[in-house]
């Protein structure tokens, strides 16, 4: 039994993308794949990471889609059994300790989790006094979320009940962080980007400051739970490990 488990894990190809726009320390394990996001906009900047502008991509949309340009690249170009997304400042992990780099999810831990659960997520982020909808309304342009809801109601009505329920909550699985089977990620990306591209056609970006322009990374944060719950996938929560100090006043929030 032990040898069979080891054998099956050996052939479980997991790639966890680490979205980054600048040079920074990276995990040493080959389960992690650093991805330079927005490479198309900075062709002379070579971080030595996988660029997000190879093959079919939306790299030039990074100012609006943030880390989603990495997951789009993986959806269209990466061959793996499981894929995940973390950030150069935020990782997933299961251990506690002073050295955060020693607490990051290992390949073996990721393999064990993926064998038992459909999707791996960071622990819920709680807002306590605000719902997800009201928090967005108070920090961003709520018309963007209203347009998203209208598109879901028209094109994906089976997702509307979960959308309405999720928006009432004071918590959610944020930061677009996950690990899931590639076939699930393919389903998710096809659904997610179809919605976001339709919202994009209804937005005038000319007057939006850079911080507010990153709206698709924020909208997608709220849609992940909608997709998971509508499809009935199981999930396992593990720790989110923050590298450095989070800038709370700005946590409206700025994506990579």
Description of each model-found segment:
Residues 11-253:
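ER/Golgi luminal nucleotide-sugar-dependent glycosyltransferases, focusing on the catalytic module
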